[in-house]
From Swiss-Prot:
One Pfam family per UniProt: GTP_EFTU_D2
UniProt cross-references to Gene3D superfamilies, sorted A to Z: P-loop containing nucleotide triphosphate hydrolases, Translation factors
Annotated region described as G5, given as residue ranges: 196-198
Domain of life, per lineage: Archaea
Annotated residues for binding of GTP: 17-24, 95-99, 157-160
Protein name: Elongation factor 1-alpha
Gene Ontology cellular-component annotations: cytoplasm
Length: 436
């Protein structure tokens, strides 16, 4: 890893795919070929893997699992593991939904992704399972699109299993194209790359086993990703993560600026309380800042705001264009997980930016085709896994939320119950606003 890492633009990349399609092996091998993980580590994993009785199957996959375990245990590990660079960018790798909280984290912005890889398998039957209703590839593709991850690369893995056959690749591409198109991606913007996570073909080095493929390697294609514009020109929105009381300083809220900019002296309003005040100072990592903009994680001191007026889940904004607070809104959702079916009146917990609030699914307006938006059924009696629908939602207390069209960062949410994410969605329209 070189010293000029910080000078390159930084992108967060998320790796998704069905459980057995080899995403961890692919990324582990990729990191080894890049020199981010040394061969000694891989050899150690191979030895450990042999002990499981499955041969050295996991020698690459465990590179990613290492990160996951250690993350779950809360240890900060050698950053090189989950960071790598290309000639153009500096990437942080987020290994996707191995765990249940992943979807919630993505929606609430804890793990923000700029771009994604979807790993499919060229092995007979595996992609069919992955893209079927309830398959993880289908679920992940839907979520990526719903959550505003607009840049996608599809890696067609396990080419070594199909003896590097162009026909097997084409079959998988056809299925993969159907999937990414159905969730709303434009095919001309989604490259497909034949790879072998196990053998290393087309990860970093061009494969000699597929002379029929003339496109880029995985590494080369990463440099085609584009940097997203920071939403600094929009009105200020800062969802509050925590509020601390610091002796001698007073009330110090902490949060990430989602849109806009702020500086000491600015007038602000906190919603839903409607309390108004002024920014006294801003700091990040214990360093005072002259200003903050979209993307910055900050703590700040406010003049004129009492501790009782601000809490986690509130949103700070510009008094001239205050954060909206909804009593009811129209949403487009996709049902991800439920043992039976959802009926109107069901009340899961809504997670939106930093807010958590019980919310009633008060009315099912229509069931829709997610690819075209065409109505398939008016006023459905129930919704089941895989359904996309337009519904009305009433949070049990007024909640700061925005339409996805105006503020994508503030207009997406997860509905959770029994420790699982039941549905993910975006706000189409605020139908009843809470006025302070």
């Amino acid at each position: 890893m070189t010293a000029h890492m910080a000078d390159k633009p930084h992108l967060n990349m998320i790796v998704t795919g069905h459980i057995d399609n080899g995403k961890s092996t692919t990324m582990g091998h990729f990191l080894m070929d890049l020199g981010v993980v040394d061969e000694r580590t891989i050899a150690q994993h191979a030895e450990e893997s042999e002990k499981t009785g499955k041969g050295d199957t996991f020698k690459y996959a465990w590179v990613m699992d290492n990160i996951k375990d250690e993350r779950e245990r809360g240890i900060t590990i050698d950053l090189a593991f989950q960071k790598f660079e290309t000639p153009k960018y500096f990437f942080t790798l987020i290994d996707a939904p191995g765990h249940r909280d992943f979807i919630k984290n993505m929606i609430t912005g804890a793990s923000e992704a700029d771009c994604a890889i979807l790993v499919l398998s060229a092995k007979e039957g595996e992609t069919d399972t992955a893209i079927a209703a309830g398959g993880q590839a289908r679920e992940h593709a839907f979520l990526l699109k719903t959550l505003g991850v607009n840049q996608l690369i599809v890696a067609v893995n396990k080419m070594d299993d199909s003896k590097y056959s162009e026909e097997a690749y084409k079959k998988t591409v056809e299925k993969g194209e159907g999937l990414v198109k159905s969730v709303g991606y434009k095919l001309e913007n989604v490259p497909f790359i034949p790879v072998s996570g196990w053998k290393g073909d087309n990860l970093v080095k061009r494969s000699e086993n597929m002379p029929w493929y003339k496109g880029k390697t995985l590494l080369e294609s990463f440099d085609d990703f584009k940097m997203a514009e920071k939403p600094v020109g929009k009105p200020l929105r800062v969802p509050i993560q925590d509020v601390y009381t610091i002796t001698g300083v007073g009330t110090v809220p902490v949060g990430r600026v989602e849109t806009g900019t702020m500086k000491p002296g600015d007038k602000i309003v906190v919603m839903p309380s409607g309390a108004q005040g002024e920014i006294k100072s801003i700091e990040t990592h214990h360093t005072e800042m002259p200003s903050a903009e979209a993307g910055d994680n900050i703590g700040f001191n406010l003049r004129g705001i009492e501790k009782k007026d601000i809490k986690r889940g509130d949103v700070l904004g510009d008094p001239a264009n205050p954060p909206k607070v909804a009593k009811e809104f129209l949403a487009q959702i996709i049902v991800i997980h439920h043992p039976t079916a959802l009926a109107p009146g069901y009340t899961p917990v809504m997670h939106c930016h930093t807010a958590q609030v019980a919310a009633i699914m008060s009315e099912f307006v229509s069931k829709i085709n997610p690819a075209t938006g065409a109505v398939e059924e008016e006023n459905p009696k129930f919704l089941k896994v895989g359904d996309s629908a337009i519904i009305k939602i009433r949070p049990v207390r007024p909640t700061p939320i925005e339409t996805f069209k105006e503020f994508p960062e503030m207009g997406r949410f997860a509905l959770r119950d029994m420790g699982a994410t039941i549905a993910a969605g975006i706000v189409k329209e605020i139908t009843e606003e809470h006025k302070v």
